[in-house]
Amino acid sequence: MNGIPTPTVDIQWASDAPDAPDETHLCEWVRHAAIAAGGVVGDITLRIVDEEEIRTLNRDYRDKDAPTNVLSFPFEMPEGLPEGAMDPLVGDIIICAAVVRREANEQHKPLVAHWAHMVTHGVLHLLGYDHIDDDDAIVMETLEIRALGELGFPDPYSPAQQESQAQPENTELNP
């Protein structure tokens, strides 16, 4: 992909998610988000979970006792290991299929577009981007909008997108 390094992606299905995108799309979106951020070498795990698992993780790691859409856990090298002692690990992205589905319905967004957004959002968090303050949010959202646009998806932050039920071109879940 234009010489920009992309991660290896491992998909874990810890929950039934019959309306989730297939692994080909999920991997494509992870890699595309990594390219939008300048590229990354290493392994990324994308785990699809139920509300109970994501609620537990959100409670244990963020002190928020509620399910959420996506969590990202960057890999931290254990102390004492020499540089290069392990294959490069980027980290884990956890997505709750039920929350993504519910949010897409509530926000009147095509489900596939919301999935692509959550995958992209999770990758950018994994790579160190956040939206805690306004300046950081602008940087992160700009990357998300650009990456999703290149994939044929509309701006997820546009009020028009939240009112649209139109399916973007080239984005069927199972072509």
Swiss-Prot record:
Q: What class of enzyme is it?
A: hydrolase
Which cofactors are reported in the record for this sequence? Zn(2+)
Compositional bias, Polar residues, is annotated for 159-175
Which compartments does it reside in?
Cytoplasm
Question: According to the UniProt record, where is the region Disordered?
Answer: 154-175
Q: Which Pfam families match?
A: YbeY (PF02130)
Q: What GO biological process terms does the UniProt entry carry, in alphabetical order?
A: rRNA processing
Q: How is the cofactor bound?
A: Binds 1 zinc ion.
Please list the GO terms describing molecular function: metalloendopeptidase activity; RNA endonuclease activity; zinc ion binding
Q: What is its main location?
A: cytoplasm
Q: What is this protein called?
A: Endoribonuclease YbeY
Organism of origin is Alcanivorax borkumensis (strain ATCC 700651 / DSM 11573 / NCIMB 13689 / SK2)
- What is the organism lineage in this UniProt record? Bacteria, Pseudomonadati, Pseudomonadota, Gammaproteobacteria, Oceanospirillales
* Gene name of the record: ybeY
